[in-house]
Amino acid sequence: MSSNSPSLETDVDDVENIVFQFQNSSLDFQSSDDFSILGIDQPHPIVRIGGMFFRGTWHQPIGTDIVVPSVNDSELSRDGLVLCKRRLMLEQIRLVPKNPSPSSSIHSPTQGEPENISEN
């Protein structure tokens, strides 16, 4: 490898762990392998897990979140711990067409119901 070629080791510095905190949602992650994030660098990213959509809001916790894997105490080691400096609070939303047909109705969400967001 020549001295002018980029090093792959620099990509390691760009890794950031993020805690996702879901509000008003009962989501079974075990059955939701299909996952994507739109606008991760924006103030309100959109997260899709399976067929459900969530609108995120970034929060900076005081200190650092420590995520501990669900394992037996005897198996716990420092290698399994994850440190996170940012938290993404997620609220479930419902996407609606920008120009809905007259037959469809859009209503305001009630407490615990997903917010309607127009598709761009």
UniProtKB/Swiss-Prot annotation:
Q: Where is the composition biased (Polar residues)?
A: 101-120
Q: Name one GO molecular function term.
A: RNA polymerase III cis-regulatory region sequence-specific DNA binding
Q: Look up the record and give one Gene Ontology term from the biological process aspect.
A: transcription by RNA polymerase III
Which Pfam families does the annotation name? TFIIIC_sub6 (PF10419)
Keyword annotations for this protein, in alphabetical order, are: DNA-binding, Nucleus, Transcription, Transcription regulation
What subcellular compartments does it reside in?
A: Nucleus
Cysteines paired by S-S bonds: none
Q: Which GO terms describe its cellular component?
A: nucleus; transcription factor TFIIIC complex
User: Which parts pass through the membrane?
Assistant: none
Region (Disordered), start-end ranges: 96-120
Matching InterPro entries: TFIIIC_triple_barrel
Its subunit composition reads: Component of the TFIIIC complex including sfc1, sfc3, sfc4, sfc6 and sfc7. The subunits are organized in two globular domains, tauA and tauB, connected by a proteolysis-sensitive and flexible linker.
The role this protein plays is: TFIIIC mediates tRNA and 5S RNA gene activation by binding to intragenic promoter elements. Upstream of the transcription start site, TFIIIC assembles the initiation complex TFIIIB-TFIIIC-tDNA, which is sufficient for RNA polymerase III recruitment and function. Part of the tauA domain of TFIIIC that binds boxA DNA promoter sites of tRNA and similar genes.
Protein name as it appears in the record: Transcription factor tau subunit sfc7
